[in-house]
């Protein structure tokens, strides 16, 4: 566990996301996309250079030194996003079986727990880049494919000591899909109960509406359930004029309140959070002052999330330095470990 407040240490763990590795996001690795107009993994894999570049990326973005670094800095939990194509090609997507097997071997070696996150469903669950394909939301047409993908992942990794849990969807679009999501969650939980070892978590997502989904699944004996909530505050100009302290007070009202109101009924994790502040707050600030502001907002958020079972920083690293790069924040002393 990463050192935070004393109460946070008692109640919850802190981990990181390994985003941008096995599911691409252009903003995280822009050099990979250089020379293409591709905005997502689907369009990138249809380019002439896609297949060769992605293979190199998968084999170099995360290496054993990264797993060692995590262990050396007391990061014992990672959330690992994958697409429905993780174990089987579905043109133009190429499977990541080799890298995923290796990731579990590394996690076992360094005693790190993996939350395996089905980040991208066939047909896209939200139409955004991190679902694999920008555009239409058509996952309901391919629901069985998603259930099959979950089952195959569970079958392959259920005996690994590193498997902490499986997350069945990431940030689904709620409008027009609420009833379908409840059905999918129930069906996915049924599938996983038939495969996973007792004690392995099934994790579902609240689609940014925790009060709506709290209690959506009732836990069966020996097969624990967690709800995943993500906390990203939109940055309207009005908020950007606030001090970081006042900005975080708004976060506290929204986030701590949501956790308090839902956690009694539905244990949860904060699957994604970060130190991101509106750029206007950091404009013309010396680097030392900027890092101090980021460090302070991180500590305030740690206190906000102490009622959650755990929290995963987005992201472990990106191509560039900055607020989404956990490793660089540790190495600059902004995050204390």
Predicted regions and their residues:
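Short acidic/His/Gly/Ser-rich catalytic and metal-binding motifs that mark active-site loops
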Residues: 86-89, 122-131, 237, 277-280
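Hydrophobic faces of well-ordered beta-strands that scaffold small-molecule active sites
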Residues: 12-18, 78-80, 114-118, 164-166, ...
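Extracellular glycoside hydrolase catalytic/binding regions
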Residues: 155-158, 162-165, 169-303, 307
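N-terminal carbohydrate-binding accessory modules
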Residues: 1-75
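Aromatic- and acidic-residue-enriched segments that line the glycan-binding/catalytic groove
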Residues: 26-39, 92-95, 123-141, 329-330
């Amino acid at each position: 566990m990463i050192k935070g407040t004393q109460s946070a240490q008692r109640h919850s763990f802190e981990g990181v996301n390994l985003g941008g590795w096995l599911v691409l996001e252009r903003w995280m690795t822009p050099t990979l996309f250089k020379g293409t107009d591709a905005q997502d993994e689907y369009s990138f894999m249809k380019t002439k250079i896609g297949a060769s570049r992605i293979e190199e990326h998968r084999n170099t973005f995360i290496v054993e030194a990264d797993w060692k670094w995590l262990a050396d800095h007391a990061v014992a939990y990672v959330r690992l996003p994958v697409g429905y194509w993780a174990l089987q090609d579905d043109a133009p997507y190429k499977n990541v079986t080799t890298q995923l097997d290796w990731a579990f071997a590394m996690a076992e070696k360094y005693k790190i727990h993996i939350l395996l996150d089905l980040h991208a469903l066939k047909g896209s669950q939200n139409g955004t880049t991190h679902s694999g394909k920008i555009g239409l939301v058509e996952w309901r047409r391919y629901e069985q494919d998603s259930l099959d993908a979950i089952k195959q992942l569970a079958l392959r990794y259920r005996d690994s000591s590193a498997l902490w849990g499986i997350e069945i969807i990431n940030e689904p679009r709620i409008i027009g899909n609420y009833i379908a999501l409840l059905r999918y969650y129930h069906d996915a939980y049924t599938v996983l109960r038939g495969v996973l070892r007792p004690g392995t978590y099934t994790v579902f997502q609240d689609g940014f509406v925790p009060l709506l989904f709290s209690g959506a699944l009732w836990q069966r004996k020996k097969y624990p359930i967690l709800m995943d909530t993500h906390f990203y505050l939109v940055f309207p100009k009005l908020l950007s004029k606030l001090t970081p302290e006042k900005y975080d007070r708004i976060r506290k009202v929204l986030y701590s309140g949501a956790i308090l109101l839902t956690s009694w009924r539905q244990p949860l994790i904060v699957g994604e959070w970060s130190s991101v502040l509106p750029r206007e707050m950091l404009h013309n600030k010396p680097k030392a002052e900027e890092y101090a502001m980021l460090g302070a907002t991180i500590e305030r958020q740690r206190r906000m999330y102490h009622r959650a079972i755990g929290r995963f920083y987005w992201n472990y690293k990106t191509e560039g330095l900055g607020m989404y790069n956990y490793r660089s924040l540790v190495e600059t002393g902004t995050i204390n470990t």
